[in-house]
């Protein structure tokens, strides 16, 4: 049975502290497991970076000062900026230099990546598997972003955040999530049902809740909640992009969970066909090679 911890804010007034029930947080639509509610907030520097990049009149000096305010965070950004993950040809030795060369959207992508790595902290094989899927999805988003008329950096940031709910559940409820993620299923919908059976919430809804709780941009919330939904005419362009990239990441060899009805690569790229015109879709082996090479940056 899933364990919970007492949230004193939700304790009935009539009960003394020592007899307080252990309860989850219940919203209008779903019950959120209380350990998920008690996860530490998203990295403060990354949150400020996300907020500042929405300001068209942003002061670049202020932007660099925010990042430089945490020397360890700034060092991690420079490490990734100089790594094979992003593949920039020139070495960058300071945050302001990096901002000048890379631009705000790429720095935002780097900041979110650093924050996500820090959020994971201790890693085991399943955390590693989930993280690789998130990064693979982000890299595929970047690769196919031009098809959707998005910048590669903006697409990458959306992709790397899409599974924050699964990572959050695994971090807060490892005992309950490990059997779910180690199982074999017919399809993704069966995985989501298994998560709900174990924790009363699936990772899609959990991710949407975390984004709102951390006051991150709302487009991330839509992506987290609906990236496993069937394509819909009302989907935003960014959501369509992430849906396609998530399936492509699974198809080229980076699934989180094994499913019998795993989409083939041709099935995964089929939503791109109307947008391609005379252009050719990227080859599966090329995508796999690129993602594998760039993922190596995280193992160094």
Tell where the protein language model's regions lie, with residue ranges.
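Short helix/strand-capping connector loops at secondary-structure junctions
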Residues: 263-278
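C-terminal accessory extensions/subdomains outside the catalytic/core fold
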Residues: 276-279, 283-299
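Conserved alpha-helical "signature site"
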Residues: 1-181, 185-266
């Amino acid at each position: 049975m899933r364990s919970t911890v007492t949230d004193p804010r939700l304790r009935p007034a009539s009960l003394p502290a020592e007899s307080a029930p252990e309860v989850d947080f219940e919203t209008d639509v779903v019950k959120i497991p209380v350990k998920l509610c008690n996860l530490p907030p998203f990295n403060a520097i990354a949150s400020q970076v996300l907020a500042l990049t929405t300001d068209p009149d942003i002061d670049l000096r202020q932007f660099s000062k925010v990042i430089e305010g945490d020397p360890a965070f700034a060092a991690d950004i420079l490490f990734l900026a100089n790594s094979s993950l992003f593949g920039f040809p020139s070495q960058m030795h300071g945050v302001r230099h990096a901002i000048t060369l890379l631009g705000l959207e790429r720095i935002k992508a780097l900041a979110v990546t650093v924050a996500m790595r820090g959020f994971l902290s201790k890693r085991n094989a399943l955390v590693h598997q989930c993280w690789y899927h998130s990064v693979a999805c982000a890299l595929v988003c970047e690769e196919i972003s031009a098809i959707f008329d998005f910048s590669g950096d903006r697409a990458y940031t959306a992709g790397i955040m899409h599974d924050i709910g699964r990572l959050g559940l695994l971090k807060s409820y490892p005992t309950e999530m490990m059997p779910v993620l180690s199982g074999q299923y017919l399809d993704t919908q069966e995985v989501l049902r298994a998560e709900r059976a174990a924790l009363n919430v699936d990772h899609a809804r959990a991710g949407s809740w975390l984004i709102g709780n951390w006051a991150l941009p709302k487009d991330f919330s839509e992506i987290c909640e609906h990236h496993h939904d069937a394509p819909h005419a009302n989907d935003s362009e960014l959501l369509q992009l992430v849906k396609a990239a998530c399936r492509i990441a699974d198809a080229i060899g980076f699934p989180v969970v094994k499913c019998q009805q795993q989409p083939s690569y041709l099935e995964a790229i089929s939503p791109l066909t109307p947008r391609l015109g005379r252009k050719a879709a990227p080859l599966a082996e090329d995508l796999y090679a690129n993602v594998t090479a760039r993922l190596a940056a995280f193992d160094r």
